[in-house]
Amino acid sequence: MTITDLVLILFIAALLAYALYDQFIMPRRNGPTLLSIALLRRGRVDSVIFVGLVAILIYNNVTSHGAQMTTWLLSALALMGFYIFWIRTPRIIFKQRGFFFANVWIEYNRIKEMNLSEDGVLVMQLEQRRLLIRVRNIDNLEKIYKLIIENQ
C-alpha cells in the first residue's frame, strides 16, 4: 500500500464520517427536532470539477496499468463525492434552543434581526454574521418564522 492509497483512505474516511454525522448524529444533538427544512443547493460547479478530476485520475490509473487498489479507492472517493454533492440535501434543523445551519449550531438569542428579501431568501443578522437561508419550498418560510417567534 502506497502513501497515495493511505491518503485516499484518509479522505474517504473523512467524507464518510461527515456524511454519517450530517445524516444521523446532527439531528439527534441538542434535543428533539422541531422542524427540519430542505434548503436549495448552492452552485454545483465545484462538485462537477471534483468528480471530473477524480474521473480523470481513475482513467489515468487504468490506462497506465496502476494498482487496482488505487483504482478502487478513487472510485470510492468519486462515489462519496457524488453522494455528498448530488444525493444529500442540505437542511436547516430547528431545535428548542436554536438551530443547525450549515452544520453550525446557532442559538435563537444570537439573532438580532430577520428580514425576507424580494426573491424569497430569509436573512438572519447575527452579532457578526449574516445568514442567507434559501429554502426549497417558499411556504416553509412561514413555518420558520412561526417557530422562531414561539421559541424566542
Swiss-Prot record:
Record bears the keyword Transmembrane helix: yes
Domain of life the protein comes from: Bacteria
Pfam families registered for this protein in UniProt: DUF986
Main localization (coarse): membrane
GO terms under cellular component: plasma membrane
Subcellular location: Cell inner membrane
Keyword Cell inner membrane annotated: yes
Keywords attached to this entry: Cell inner membrane, Cell membrane, Membrane, Transmembrane, Transmembrane helix
NCBIfam families from the UniProt entry: PRK02913.1
HAMAP family per UniProt: UPF0266
Protein name (record): UPF0266 membrane protein YobD
Organism: Salmonella dublin (strain CT_02021853)
Lineage: Bacteria, Pseudomonadati, Pseudomonadota, Gammaproteobacteria, Enterobacterales
